[in-house]
Structure formats: structure tokens, C-alpha cells
Amino acid sequence: MNYMKWILLTAGLSIILAVNIFAQENVIMPDLTKIVSGDGWRVVNREPEMVTENGQSCVHFKAENETGGIAWLENVDFNNGIIEADLKGRNARGRSFLGIAFRGVNDSTYDVVYFRPFNFVPEANVKGHSVQYISHPKYTWFKLREEHPGEFENSIVPPPNPDQFFHVKIVIEKPKIKVYVDQQEEPSLVVDELSDRTGGKIGLWMDYVTEGMFANLKILQAEE
């Protein structure tokens, strides 16, 4: 190998190494076991417990009342990037709504990408209500469905098993949001954000009467 080739190879390896190190520094993998103790997390209207489901350790949120609930990750300000997690709801019609909140300001002001597992069954999935984006407090699911039908919710093809964990990857590059389910190459939902907020908290979100399980939360902060 001549000197010039050695220089180019060394430079290329240095760049790759630097990129990998930089990427690792921007990856956050929160410890979900700390949700139970409240260390670095703040839980609203839910009772968390650690359980093992199908061999996987996860946090289970019990619905003690009919109000919505959320677990806020403290001390992380998320702007753009990727949020991944494994979620499990229930195949119970009208009683399972869970997802990932971001752009969180307080307990009533945030954006959410959430899922309706009871709509994963084929006869319901075709109606286009399996995955939804909302922006509270102004843009509720009802307002968006009424004023922008089919724009902020969609089917998932192929749909996950409503009684099992499913993997979610949410790519956020303001104003664009893309939602991928179970390693699919094509997004199940693509929308433009409705809020003008930048940054904010990330949370594990459940609507009213919803119990939920969450595992393997991973956050990749985009380079600013």
C-alpha cells in the first residue's frame, strides 16, 4: 500500500470512528425500572410496576381511574431525532390507546403519536384508525378526524398482533413526523407537526382507561 492510499484509508477510518462516537454520545436509553421509584421520571395518573411479559422486562402502567396518564422523562429536552420503543396494549375496543408524547410543556400541552391496538385486527385496520397524531390541547383526535379526515391517522400495513408487543420508530425532523412500525421500510404515518413548539419533554402516554406496557425506550438526538 503506497503512502497516499494509507493516508486516505486512515482519514476515512477516523471519520467513521468519529461519526460512530458522536452518534453514541447522542443516544439515550432511559432506565425504565426507575419509573417505579420516580428517579428521573414523573408519573401522572398511573401506577407503574415492573413485570416480565413473554420473557421481556417492561414497565406496566395500571389504570386506577378513567383519566389519561403519562410518565414524563425528566431532564431530557428533545428537539429533533428518533424515538424508538416496544409497546403493548390490549385488544379491547375503545379501551386501549397508548403511545409516545413529545414537545411536552406540561401535563396538558404536548404532541403524541399513539396507537389503537384494538384496531389492528384486519376488519378494523382498513378503516384507517390504527395510528394517530395529535397536538394537545388544541388538536384533539376528534377535532382532527372531523376537520381533516384521514390526514393525521392511518392504517398499519401489515398490522401488528393486537395482543403482542410491537416496535415503534418515530422520526421527527420538524415539521415532518414519520412513524414506522415493526421494522417496516415504509412509514405507516407521515404528517406535519401542528404546534410551533421546539424541544420539550418525552413521555410514555396512555389515554383514558388505558393500561399499557413499554420496553426498550431509545432516544437519538439529532445533531443541532
Labelled PLM ranges:
Residues 1-11:
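Bacterial N-terminal signal peptides that target proteins for export
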Residues 24-224:
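Extracellular glycan-recognition regions
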Residues 9-20:
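Bacterial N-terminal signal peptides
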